[in-house]
Amino acid sequence: MTPRPESDEAAKEYYSFEEAVMGPIGFGGPHTYRDYLAALHKTALPLNVAAMIGTGTVKICVKGFADTPYTQQELDDARALIEDAMAAGAPGVSLGIMYLPECYSSTDEFAYILEPVGRYHRVITTHIRGEGDSMVQSVREVIEIARRVGCALEISHFKSCGMKNWGKDIHTAIADIEAARAAVSYTHLRAHETCADL
C-alpha cells in the first residue's frame, strides 16, 4: 500500500502510469498510510493484512516522475511520509529501485528518506537496481542502504538475469550477502526466560 499523491495533477499522473498495467482504476483513495488503515478496518477481510509503504509512490507524491534529484524539501517530505507510515504501524518499506521513478534516486537519497525504518526497527524489501550486468553493484547498494539506515533487508526475487551472467556474478553477490549478515551484531547472544519470569 502506498499513499495517493495529494495533488490531483500528481494523482492523475500516477493513475495513468498504473492503468497501463492494471487497467482502469478509480480516481481517489487514501492520501496517507493512516487513511489506508482506517479504510481497511472498515472492510470485512477474510485474512490479515500487513501492508508496507512503497518508495515509488512516496516519490511520486513529492516530485512526480521527474528524473531529477530530490531537493532538500522533497527529501524531508518523503521522509515524513515514511515516518508517518512507521508510526501508524507499517511493517516496513518496499523499494523498487529498478522501476520508474525510483531508478532516478541515489543511494544517499534512499538512506536519507528511509531513516525512520531503522528507528522503528522495521524492514526494507527491495527489487535491486539491476539483476544482469550490474547485479553485484546493485546488491552492494542495497546492503549499504540497509547498513546506513540500520534495518533488516530482504532482496526480492534475487536472481542473475541474462545467459552471459548465469553462474558468473551470482556467487560474488551471495558472498557479499553472507558477509553482510555476518557483520550484523545481535546484542542478546544468550538469554534465559521462563513463563514464571513473565
Language model features with spans:
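Functional cores that coordinate and move charged inorganic groups
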Residues: E83-S185
